[in-house]
Amino acid sequence: MRVTLYHNEDAGEGASVHDLTATIERHGHTVVAVVGTSDDATRILEAESDLVVASGGDGTVSTAARVLAGKATPMAILPNGTANNLARSMNITGTTDEIVAAWATGTRRPFDLGRASGPWGERWFIESVGGGLIAHSIRAFESQPPELDRPRREELIDAVRMHSEVLSSLRAVPWTMTLDGVSVSGEFLLVAVLNIPFIGPNLELCPHADPTDGEFAVVMADERHRDAIARHLQHRAAERDIGLGVTCWRARSVEIEQGDLLHIDDMVFDWPSEARVSIQIEPASLHVLV
């Protein structure tokens, strides 16, 4: 196959472009282009390749997915980031060599994307849209000075601890939403419109979220769930898996009329007064080689 490699060398503990290219070519493929940064992402489609390979963390994969949305060219993932939620959701595991070797017998799986429209315009997303704990934790993490060349495990644990610190002082705020025409309102600590089960530092908010079923999983956690969220974070910090235990709603369309600081994947947006956000599922907008 002719491969375009979209690679973020700053992600996690990943290999160099040279090493990745050598591995891909060793398995009989031709690397026809290498794209390095998010600013260059639109160049992904310039080369006439059979496959776009996103090598990096969830941010790198999300950027590639937005460029490929609605296009025929499939994407493969080489998970080299910190959380690797998207690869984990598609059960893409193993060494780089093992993952590349599997492409020869792999299948193209349809993958849903979401589209969020609001004061910022329209934006595709692959992981989630939400507010409360996750958005405030992303904002808090962004305020910290970057530390390079740290082991993935340390980065994950620090991110979980940051979520715990944010939760300790977080107040539930009013949200007003409509899920497939059904009105829902309340004061929530966390709201998440999920395309995949995992979010942030491998937090499994809804194990049944499926990026191939044409629906979102929607989680709304209020003050009654504070202790459950805290336990979930404690177990993640200890690298143990335990479910959040909060009801997951199903919806194809979500309208938010009142809310809090909002995140779309890993981008955070302030909530303007009287703003409305519309979130739609776009089934099979992407194809992933697994």
Sequence positions of predicted segments:
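Short N-terminal binding/cap micro-motifs at the start of the first secondary-structure element
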Residues: 12-16, 200-201, 286
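ATP/nucleoside-binding phosphotransfer catalytic cores, i.e., glycine-rich phosphate-binding loops
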Residues: 179-180, 185, 210-290
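ATP/NTP phosphate-donor binding region
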Residues: 1-55, 62, 97-101
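Catalytic core of DAGKc-family lipid kinases
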Residues: 4-5, 18, 27, 32-36, ...
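Short Gly/Thr/Asp-enriched flexible loops that form oxyanion-binding sites at enzyme active sites
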Residues: 60-71
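Glycine-rich phosphate/pyrophosphate-binding beta-alpha loops
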Residues: 130, 134, 192-205, 268
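Gly/Ser/Thr-rich active-site loops/lids in small-molecule metabolic enzymes
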Residues: 145-157, 198-227
